[in-house]
């Protein structure tokens, strides 16, 4: 990462991989250490836990799992901006777009680190594919 995008991006990827492993694990759909790390904010993952079956494509799928967890966080951020009069969902989304445009390398590094933490989790689980894919490969 450092050779391609620079040292700053490598540090961002490293920190996001660490944070992703602690707070954005594919196991947020179960009672897990990752869920406990959220403490009192663990309730934020209730809809995800309710809607996403464990080891499904949406929890453990390459790219899709990380995207789903980031979508849950973005949805909660948008809900907060709607609930707080001083904030605005449009401002949040515009700010996010500006950050992506102004700092594309850092944004890519952030996403690579988060996805990397998910892959590390999947490999440590012993089978890096969601259950749906594993069943198809066994046939």
Give the positions of each predicted feature.
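N-terminal membrane-targeting hydrophobic helices
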Residues: 1-139
């Amino acid at each position: 990462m450092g050779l391609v995008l620079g040292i700053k991006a490598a540090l961002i990827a490293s920190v996001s991989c660490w944070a992703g492993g602690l707070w954005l694990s594919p196991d947020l759909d179960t009672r897990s250490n990752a869920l406990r790390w959220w403490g009192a904010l663990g309730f934020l993952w209730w809809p995800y836990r309710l809607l996403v079956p464990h080891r499904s494509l949406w929890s453990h799928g390459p790219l899709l799992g990380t995207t789903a967890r980031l979508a849950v966080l973005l949805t909660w951020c948008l809900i907060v901006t709607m609930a707080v009069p001083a904030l605005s969902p449009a401002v949040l989304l515009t700010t996010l777009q500006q950050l992506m445009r102004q700092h594309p390398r850092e944004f890519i590094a952030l996403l690579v680190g988060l996805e990397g933490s998910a892959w590390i989790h999947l490999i440590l689980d012993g089978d890096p594919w969601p259950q749906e894919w594993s069943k198809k490969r066994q046939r």
